[in-house]
Each structure stands twice: as structure tokens, then as C-alpha cells.
């Protein structure tokens, strides 16, 4: 097997990784500090003087973190007592072991980008955890909820579209296929709403995405939806398969999560799947990633919406969860810095859970980076090989491109894109639905 290429890293000056560590991450830390400042009176009302002291302590820890990052200090071990602390510190040791004699310690602008960026979010969590009684405060909650409220028009249009299709069982097979393709594309473009890319600024969806699909089609660089349809429609017709399980590894809350829930509802209603398992994060992560609280909050707010299409969908989704047809899982592995190819060793229980799926949909850029090991693969390198042996079940990456990493393109395709749009890899303007089928 050929040697794997180098990791993406901020040591490549001018690269997207470099600009993220230099500009976007300090901006996110500043926003987190501002959020804590703004909630000072709320902390006082809830916890008295203790709340004020906790806010000061958290801000002090976060300011120290920002300074370490901006001055390229060595990465230090975590000191909290969480379930994953020892795994993080072991991984830091592993990063240290990869360095050559003159390299010094793992540092922000030198070590793999995936490691240091994940580490920053884990340190934010540590700062809050070390500041009781505000230790369960989600510093990103506000911006996630804002994204949902600002996207109401698009959410209403999408829910109305879904309800018009019901009962889905009454549709002809070609109609089901057509809608399946449509809702996969909506889930793809919903991935544009990423608050970590915008430094935590508003990134809501205000246009009716259904009307834009035709115009957006040329921006899908790899479209394996036919293969997904072939897999699920075949399973549906296989009498020996009474259970068809689809897992969705979630990315962003807000509008993107709604697009995932609408897709899941359609899969269930059309009997392309009999159960859906959602996987989210166990701690606040990368600004807008879904936690269990976000998942339940969205379903609850959909259900209590004064817009009929939204409340109908919300009630429906709550019923699916109550019946056990939909299940939400989280696992500490999703917020570790490890590439997914080591999941069987690091989190064998999670890998075994994913092996129960007939199809896994991995949403978003961070999942793609972890699937690919965040390495500088050639653009034409095969997707299956870049997965480095990770294959719990047939899987598909659904992401808009927000980092300098993409495999499986046709020869000449990347060069053509670079000539017409030099920033095609990082703006979220282009997307992929990239499938790795049954072995």
C-alpha cells in the first residue's frame, strides 16, 4: 500500500488550515468570551456571587487559551476529569511521538490541523466544565437557536413540500425516486449553514431551497444518488429484510438538521427505511454541531410552532421517536481528534453499532475530514482507498466543500475548477454526494 500523504496543517502558510487557526479560531474564542460576558446578570440571578466568579474564571481560562493559540504555544494536556480526558492526553503523547528531534512540542501552527482544531473546542468545554455552577452552559446555544428562528420561511416551505407528498406510499416508484433525489440534494445544500465557517456569525437559510435545486445541480461535483437509490430500493424489495436501518451522522443544528429530519421522514414514510438512527455530539462542538439538547429542542419547537406544516412535522417526528422508529445516540468518539479508520480500536462499541446499519450518511465537512484522515490526498485518489479500511457499512458523504480536501474527482476536473474559481474548495459553494458501496 502506498504511503499516506501528509496531514493538512497550519504550517502551510496561506492554506485554509493556516487561515482558520490564524483568523477564524481566535474570532470564535472572542465570540465565546463575549457570550459569557452578556450572560453575566443571568449567572448572577441563578447562582448569586458564585455565578459571577464562575463567569470570571471561564473567561480567564478562555483568554489564556486564545493567547496560547495566537502565540503558537505548545499544546498542553487536559486537566479536567471527563470520560475522554485520558484518551485526549494519550493522543497528545502520540502526536509528540511523531515529531522529529528538532521539532519541539506539538503546537498550533505546526501539528495536524484536525488535531489542534478539535483540541480548541475540547479546551472550550474544559474551561466551562472547570467553572461550576455554570459548567453545563452551552456557549453556542444562542447562535444555534437563532439559526433556526431566522430560517423559519425555508423550514415552512420544506415541511409543506413533505406533507404534500404524504401518504408517500401512494406515489409511483419514479415519483419516490425523484423526491428521494430532491431531498438528498436539500440535505446537501442545508450543509451550507455552518456557523464555524462564518466565525459564529449568522448563516441562516432564507431562500426556498426547493426552487433553487435545478440551478445548484452544476455545483454537485460528485453525485452518487443513483447508487444510494439502487441500494435502498433493492433492500425494500428483499423480503428477507424486514428491517432496513439508515444511520445519519449529523453535522449542524438549525436549518441543516431540519433538512436531515425531512429526509429521514421521507425515508421512513416511503418504506425505504424502517428505522433511522441519528448520531450527534455529546458536548457543544464546532459552534453549530447538534447535541441531544439541540435535537430535542428543535423537535419541541417544531411541534409548538404556530405554522401548521411545522407543527404537523414536529408532532410526527416526536411520535417516531416515541415508537422507537427514530433513535438519537451520542458517543464521546465523535468529539475526539481521531480519524475514523481507528474507530474499531478506539471505540469498538460505536463501530459495532454502525455495523448494524444498511446505509450510513455522514453529513458535513468535519465528518469528511475524519473519514479521509485529513490528509493531502490527490484529487483523483479513490474514495474507498482514502477511507483507509473504514467500512462498517455502505456509506455516503454528503457535504459542501469547506476545506482543501477532496478525493474521487475525474482527471482534469480539479484543474478546471481552479481555473474558473480559485477558491472552489473552501467556500461551501460546491457539494458532493459520495458513496462507498457494499464490499
UniProtKB/Swiss-Prot annotation:
Residues with N-acetylalanine modification: 2
Cross-referenced InterPro entries: ARMT-1-like_metal-bd_sf, ARMT1, ARMT1-like_metal-bd
Ligand binding (substrate): 251-252, 365-369, 402
GO molecular function: enzyme binding; fructose 6-phosphate aldolase activity; fructose-1-phosphatase activity; metal ion binding; protein carboxyl O-methyltransferase activity; protein-glutamate O-methyltransferase activity; S-adenosylmethionine-dependent methyltransferase activity
Free-text description of this protein's post-translational modifications in UniProt: Automethylated.
Disulphide linkage map: none
Reactions catalysed, as given in the entry: beta-D-fructose 1-phosphate + H2O = D-fructose + phosphate; beta-D-fructose 6-phosphate = dihydroxyacetone + D-glyceraldehyde 3-phosphate; L-glutamyl-[protein] + S-adenosyl-L-methionine = [protein]-L-glutamate 5-O-methyl ester + S-adenosyl-L-homocysteine
Domain of life: Eukaryota
Keywords: Acetylation, DNA damage, Hydrolase, Manganese, Metal-binding, Methyltransferase, Nickel, Phosphoprotein, S-adenosyl-L-methionine, Transferase
Post-translational modification Phosphoserine, affected residues: 4
Presence of the UniProt keyword NAD in the record: no
Motif Subfamily III RTxK motif per record, residues: 399-402
N6-acetyllysine carried by residues: 40
Gene3D superfamilies (UniProt xref): 1.20.930.60, Uncharacterised protein PF01937, DUF89, domain 3
GO biological process per UniProt: DNA damage response; methylation
Note on domains (UniProt): Subfamily III proteins have a conserved RTxK motif about 40-50 residues from the C-terminus; the threonine may be replaced by serine or cysteine.
PANTHER family in the cross-refs: DAMAGE-CONTROL PHOSPHATASE ARMT1
Homology family: Belongs to the damage-control phosphatase family. Sugar phosphate phosphatase III subfamily.
Function (record text): Metal-dependent phosphatase that shows phosphatase activity against several substrates, including fructose-1-phosphate and fructose-6-phosphate. Its preference for fructose-1-phosphate, a strong glycating agent that causes DNA damage rather than a canonical yeast metabolite, suggests a damage-control function in hexose phosphate metabolism. Has also been shown to have O-methyltransferase activity that methylates glutamate residues of target proteins to form gamma-glutamyl methyl ester residues. Possibly methylates PCNA, suggesting it is involved in the DNA damage response.
Record's protein name: Damage-control phosphatase ARMT1
Lineage of the organism: Eukaryota, Metazoa, Chordata, Craniata, Vertebrata
Gene name for this UniProt entry: Armt1
